[in-house]
Amino acid sequence: MAVTTSMSFNLMASFRGMSLSSSSSSSFFKGEFGPSSLRLPNKSPLSVSPFPLTIESAHKKGAGSTKNGRDSKGQRLGVKIYGDQVAKPGAIIIRQRGTKFHPGKNVGIGKDHTIFALIDGLVKFEKYGPDKKKVSVYPREIQPENPNSYRARKRENFRLQREKKKARREGYSFQPQLILASAATDNADESAVC
């Protein structure tokens, strides 16, 4: 009951400003529109807009489709073994789409442009032409270690600690001995060169 009264009140409010007198009605039906023939109604706060409030878009899947907003997972492309790192035979060096990197020495290329190592060695990235890059694998050359390097000194220090600990467990007191590398001679003056 209350709904029908409010709707009738809205209709009355929308037609309040229109007047259809005998003089203006004939001109209205003839198609003559003027300021005297048609007066627009005053806007009231209770009036209903002529268009429904719907949001439309040009495409069927624009707003709230369940098929929207999805993305495929990443393809895990890129460099897998970097320069100056060791690669074993068959190890994948680069996964790529197209040939961003071209194969060099001792590497192969798969049908999906994956570059892989053919031999055991170090990976090197090289320039190839003005704007291309080439990947090669070179055999690893093992260089002798410097005895004065930090790694060698540290290894020797840990070896001495293990020997001391082992000697303590056995009850033997370990005393490091100094050994001179020079030959033992009776006359030190004869061998000295000044």
UniProtKB/Swiss-Prot annotation:
The organelle targeting sequence, given as a residue range: 1-57
GO molecular function: structural constituent of ribosome
GO biological process, one term: translation
UniProt KW keywords: Chloroplast, Plastid, Ribonucleoprotein, Ribosomal protein, Transit peptide
Record-linked Pfam families: Ribosomal_L27 (PF01016)
One Gene Ontology CC term in the entry: ribosome
Region (Disordered): 57-76
Cell compartments where the protein resides: Plastid, Chloroplast
UniProt entry tagged with the keyword Plastid: yes
Subunit structure: Component of the chloroplast large ribosomal subunit (LSU). Mature 70S chloroplast ribosomes of higher plants consist of a small (30S) and a large (50S) subunit. The 30S small subunit contains 1 molecule of ribosomal RNA (16S rRNA) and 24 different proteins. The 50S large subunit contains 3 rRNA molecules (23S, 5S and 4.5S rRNA) and 33 different proteins.
Function field: Component of the chloroplast ribosome (chloro-ribosome), a dedicated translation machinery responsible for the synthesis of chloroplast genome-encoded proteins, including proteins of the transcription and translation machinery and components of the photosynthetic apparatus.
Family statement: Belongs to the bacterial ribosomal protein bL27 family.
Protein name: Large ribosomal subunit protein bL27c
Native organism taxonomy: Eukaryota, Viridiplantae, Streptophyta, Embryophyta, Tracheophyta
